[in-house]
């Protein structure tokens, strides 16, 4: 018996809602941009992978920014892989950009983290590029209005967070503001999580100081406002990932809003990551749900955390193997002023999941 046209249409619409295809993080494919591409003419913008029309237009009008944004894309991949290296989902699928699997195409907890991290990373990289003088359109951040304490003075070159936030959000949010970019629920989710990433970035701005004085006495400290490293921001976002709230798209009055699924008596908090679709346990390989599985992943036999062999291997057990490690040893300090070391080799036992 052939399925009815109505059934096929309903199935198609259901698939669209489940995948929630959105182009918001496809720009991470810029990480693959060849270094030989000079990016000094506006026609080069069309050659860049993963950009939507509005991002191509931003590229043409802000050509000097693009090398910095390419660097941000590389930082997102490196930082995400490092942050989740000890978990079943290890962010490996981010390297498939712009052709993601369902772990990042759907409105999952994992996509929530990547959207937040990518929004933070692009603003972070631009803010730092202003400080180092790599961008002609910006310079150091403003001197804070508050008076520093005794023995302190404002100086140095602050990270230009304000410029980073303005230009970063223009670029990273552009795909979600297109009319044809997935379901409304997914767009709202991605915009919310991107803003959470920028909030964590703003909260990371801290006072950094350098000592001045006779014989290193540090009688005066020159201080400026600087951002924490992206890896620290990613760790804060990972904690939000672990406590993320599942939401539903529910009518309230004449409009629909995202509200917590299990506690919809309160609105979504501005500081929490949110997701629409539950994730698999990532134990077994299943590309239909975007899971690479944990077979052959390295695990820690003595750990009680997420990298433990019990958790990482999902109860399947693990295999030991011997690995040779070369490290520096027998180091000697020579006056003045250098250190020489020998190279020593030792064998260590490691474990991989069955």
Curated annotation (Swiss-Prot):
Disulfide bonds join 80-91, 130-138, 140-157, 209-223, 211-218, 283-314, 299-309, 313-353, 329-344, 331-341, 336-337. Residues 1-24 form the signal peptide. The lineage of its organism: Eukaryota, Metazoa, Chordata, Craniata, Vertebrata. A lipid is attached at residue 215 (O-palmitoleoyl serine). InterPro entries: Wnt (IPR005817), Wnt_C (IPR043158), Wnt_CS (IPR018161). GO terms for cellular component: cytoplasm; extracellular space. This is Protein Wnt-11. GO terms for biological process: canonical Wnt signaling pathway; cell fate commitment; intracellular signal transduction; negative regulation of canonical Wnt signaling pathway; neuroendocrine cell differentiation; positive regulation of DNA-templated transcription; secondary palate development; signal transduction. Belongs to the Wnt family. It comes from the Eukaryota. Palmitoleoylation is required for efficient binding to frizzled receptors. Depalmitoleoylation leads to Wnt signaling pathway inhibition. Ligand for members of the frizzled family of seven transmembrane receptors. May play a role in the formation of dermal structure, both limb and feather buds. Is likely to signal over only few cell diameters. The gene is WNT11. It is found in: Secreted, Extracellular space, Extracellular matrix. GO terms for molecular function: cytokine activity; frizzled binding. Glycans are attached at residues 40, 90, 300, 304. Keywords: Developmental protein, Disulfide bond, Extracellular matrix, Glycoprotein, Lipoprotein, Secreted, Signal, Wnt signaling pathway.
């Amino acid at each position: 018996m052939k399925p009815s046209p109505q059934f096929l249409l309903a199935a198609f619409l259901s698939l669209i809602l489940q995948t929630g295809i959105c182009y918001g993080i496809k720009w991470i494919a810029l990480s693959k941009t060849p270094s030989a591409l000079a990016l000094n003419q506006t026609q080069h913008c069309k050659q860049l992978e993963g950009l939507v029309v509005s991002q191509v237009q931003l590229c043409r009008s802000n050509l000097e920014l693009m090398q910095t944004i390419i660097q941000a894309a590389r930082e997102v991949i490196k930082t995400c892989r490092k942050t989740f290296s000890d978990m079943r989902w290890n962010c490996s699928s981010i390297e498939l950009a712009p052709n993601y699997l369902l772990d990042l195409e759907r409105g999952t907890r994992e996509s929530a983290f990547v959207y937040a991290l990518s929004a933070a990373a692009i603003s972070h990289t631009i803010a730092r590029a202003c400080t180092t003088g790599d961008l002609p359109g910006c310079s150091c951040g403003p001197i804070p209005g508050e008076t520093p304490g005794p023995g302190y003075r404002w100086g140095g070159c602050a990270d230009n967070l304000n410029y980073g936030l303005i230009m970063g959000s223009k670029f990273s949010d552009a795909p979600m503001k297109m009319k044809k970019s997935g379901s409304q629920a997914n767009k709202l989710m991605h915009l919310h999580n991107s803003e959470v990433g920028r909030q964590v970035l703003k909260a990371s701005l801290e006072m950094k100081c350098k000592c001045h004085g006779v014989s290193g006495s540090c009688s005066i400290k020159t201080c400026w406002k600087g951002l924490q490293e992206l890896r620290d921001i990613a760790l804060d976002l990972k904690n939000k990932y672990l406590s993320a709230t599942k939401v539903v798209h529910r009518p309230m009055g004449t409009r629909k809003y995202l509200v917590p699924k299990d506690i919809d008596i309160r609105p979504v908090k501005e500081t929490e990551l949110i997701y629409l679709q539950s994730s698999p346990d990532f134990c077994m390989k299943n590309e239909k749900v975007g899971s690479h599985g944990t077979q052959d992943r390295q695990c820690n036999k003595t750990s009680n955390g997420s990298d433990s062999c019990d958790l990482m291997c999902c109860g399947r057990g693990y295999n030991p193997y011997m690995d040779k490690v070369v490290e520096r040893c027998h180091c000697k300090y020579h006056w003045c002023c250098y250190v020489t070391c020998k190279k020593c080799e030792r064998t260590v036992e490691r474990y991989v999941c069955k």
